[in-house]
Amino acid sequence: MPRSCSALAYAAEQHAGQLRKVDGAPFIVHPIEVGSLLYDAGAGDDVIAAGLLHDTIEKTGADAAELRRRFGARTAALVAAVTEDEHINGYERRKAALCRQAEAAGPDAMMVFAADKVSKVRELPVERARSEAETVSRTRQRRLNHYRRCLEMLERHIGDSPLVRQLRAELEARSAVSVRRPALADAV
């Protein structure tokens, strides 16, 4: 059985009973979307499995040792690379550390990170107002700013990935302000 199939079953079991805050849907919808995005982008089975498992350490009783035992060192390392450090205080600091952590872990971790961000941005409603600052809550604005910073990092490293293009499109659809494209010199 492919590792991703086992990962899906495990993630569904771990996330059983959890609901998404944004719409009350079963939480497992999010990891399934992340895994599907990775599959569509041509990722390998270990990467897809990591996408399906990416929230298990943060949101369930799972730990890295259990993931390593069940799914192998590579998949567990990818999950760890996209798992927030709960000991870092403050949203901005914690999210910046997570972005650096995914970046340092390499292209496969960045793909999982990108797929997660695409899925999370899709949870935000499309902004229809002229000025985002006039109508958007500070929480939403903070999240959009975080996702824009993630996009900048991802474009520097895996800019040719369809996931990065999707993230840009999703952000632009939800933003009254166009997302800045890095200059060619920035990408070098």
Walk through the language-model features, giving the residues of each.
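Active-site helical microenvironments for divalent-metal-assisted chemistry
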Residues: 1-188
